[in-house]
Amino acid sequence: MPQLSKSLSFDGRDIRLELGLFAPQAGGSVLISSGDTAVLVAATRSTAREGIDFLPLTVDYEERMYAAGRIPGGFLRREGRPPERATLTSRLIDRPLRPLFPSWLRDDLQVVATTLSMDETVPPDVLAATGASIATLVAKIPFYGPMAAVRVGLVGDDFIINPTYREIEKGDLDLVVAGTPAGVIMVEAGANQLPEADVIEAIDFGYEAVQELIKAQQSLLAELGIEQILPEAPNADNTLENFVRDRASSGVQQVLQHFSFTKSERDAALDEVKASVVEAIAALPEEDPVRSVTAAEPKALGNTFKALTKTLMRQQILRDGVRVDGRKLDQVRPISSQVGLLPPRVHGSGLFQRGLTQVLSIATLGTPGDAQELDDLHPDTQKRYLHHYNMPPYSVGETRPMRSPGRREIGHGALAERALLPVLPSKEEFPYVIRVVSEVLSSNGSTSMGSVCGSTLALMDAGVPIKKPVSGAAMGLIREGDEYRVLTDIQGIEDFLGDMDFKVAGTDQGITALQMDMKIHGLPLEIIADAINQAKPARLHILNKMLEAIATPRADLSTYAPRLFRIQINPEQIGLVIGPGGKTIRSITEQTGAKIDIEDTGAVTISAVDADSALRAKSIIEGMTRTITAGDVYIGKVTRIIPIGAFVEFLPGKEGMIHISQIADYRVARVEDELTVGDEVVVKVREIDQKGRVNLTRKGIDPEEVSAARAAVEAS
């Protein structure tokens, strides 16, 4: 392929494309850059796999630490398992890309995006998503593209395209929009309780920029002389389809209209209908075409029956406006919320159930040292709020090996985490590190939004002073031509057989998180707006049900939660608290049993299993760092005696010396005649010398000063 360079501009930011220079043996590749961030994306196609009924597409996003001029940590000093954010970026690329391949394609496809260079300004994820479309088109893989993605930020009252990390942090919106010529195909967003109208406007704003990138890709293909392949499905033999439709349509319709069925009863009834078709096929002569098809393709019957069920369910919703469980299109399943179900060793817990979906969320409070250290290319290096999502096989009545979290679990956990971030208290207000684990105990659709609701309950039960409670709902879509129906609170079968899964989370003030995935090639803004607006009353209904279990965060933390105190010291005194080689801070920890975390700003967080230990450590540090002036009066204890005087600890960790001449108003021959180690004495600061040493006296102290000093001790 000849080398080709192209440059585009958005809001003063350039996007540069380089083709034909890298990865010559890949099916198609592009280096896509903006600022000093550069991502190489390669797409490759292999021959079709035999005997599969799905598209074997793999999308991998790879980060290399050299991209930021860094060497990886760890013993091996090389990249290992992808960090969580890299996994989320892989999903961000995959989700708008996957629906655009034809359903009949069985070729092995792999898209690999590698960040080769990265500055601390431009995020690489949307570049990688757009690059994936370009690489796929250049590779001449059957594809209903082009597809492009942009990020939309909101700084003040202005939307901006592809904001920098700093602009994202300052703004109230971080939204990624991906689209095709047919419309919007994917949305992912975190927002600071934005109204629905603002989010819809942002999606529209982003899609306008997406269209420019789509036109640029079409122009690029023309320059390269590549004719886009618009795939056509191979000619299919309808013999089996007609047979199944004739034998099973009536039975499937009866099952779908039996609204009192539970999920398991419905599944069993559909299996019975399918079994009757199997019996009918078995009774056919061996040379019958239907029997020949099922013998040659063992999965053909199952796929055909599934397609029939999908068609009939969709027709029922479009025609009658009624769903398989009898609900109206905008109706939410029955809801149950409970808190504090687990023993008190657990800091906070919430059980949320919506229909057959049940999520148990558990909140744990930790110290600042429990924050997750992040070793990736993102500017953020720590996380103080963690949400982890688990979905064991028993949640869907299945058995399979238990594995470490996969991409789905990581993605669902991150979405629920994002939904709660805007309402969490600041580190200054609530210095705890917070971890919530959502255990999906039963799944029938919308477990990620169930995790949002369960997380809210668990945090409130744990006494975390969240600004607002958050709830979430998953919206679905059935669309045939220009006719469509938006479904509220979709269950498993509607998710599986529908066209859209649109998750919306937020408070009574506005949206905090969005995630929209498609199975079709794009949607107009009108339908997206309908889904967002229809989600609001559902969210508020769910929220009101949750608040029946717990209306406000608990006033007190669990007895078993660590106790934290946060104080501010002069950054110049950090060395004083730490001491040479950490000697002083270790001594405080050994004396009190408390854990001490000091930030570069001078913020000190003191934590312990009980309040008394933390308060003792707090008192010591405050004493060490307190500003002492001549004339201050303290109550102290004698710690050492030397021939010329005595040392007194007048503040925790702070000592001064009383010279023998300052012990009494009369002449003292021996210090031991007046003082012994352990004596409580009232002392006044006489002076602080040039070396910072404190000289004390017992002379000239008024009774009022003694009373004030004793009152200060009692108050502390």
Swiss-Prot record:
Family statement drawn from the similarity comment of this UniProt entry: Belongs to the polyribonucleotide nucleotidyltransferase family.
Localization: Cytoplasm
Any one GO molecular-function label of the UniProt entry: polyribonucleotide nucleotidyltransferase activity
Protein residues bound to Mg(2+): D495, D501
Protein name: Polyribonucleotide nucleotidyltransferase
Principal location: cytoplasm
NCBIfam families linked: polynuc_phos, PRK11824.1
Keyword RNA-binding tagged: yes
Function: Involved in mRNA degradation. Catalyzes the phosphorolysis of single-stranded polyribonucleotides processively in the 3'- to 5'-direction.
Every S1 motif domain range: 631-699
This protein's GO CC annotations: cytosol
GO biological process, alphabetically ordered: mRNA catabolic process; RNA processing
Keywords assigned: Cytoplasm, Magnesium, Metal-binding, Nucleotidyltransferase, RNA-binding, Transferase
Catalytic activity: RNA(n+1) + phosphate = RNA(n) + a ribonucleoside 5'-diphosphate
Species, as recorded: Synechococcus sp. (strain ATCC 27144 / PCC 6301 / SAUG 1402/1)
InterPro entries: ExoRNase_PH_dom1 (IPR001247), ExoRNase_PH_dom2 (IPR015847), ExoRNase_PH_dom2_sf (IPR036345), KH_dom (IPR004087), KH_dom_type_1 (IPR004088), KH_dom_type_1_sf (IPR036612), NA-bd_OB-fold (IPR012340), PNPase (IPR012162)
Cofactors, names only: Mg(2+)
E.C. numbers: 2.7.7.8
Pfam family, one: RNase_PH_C
Domain called KH: residue spans: 562-621
Cysteine-cysteine disulfides: none
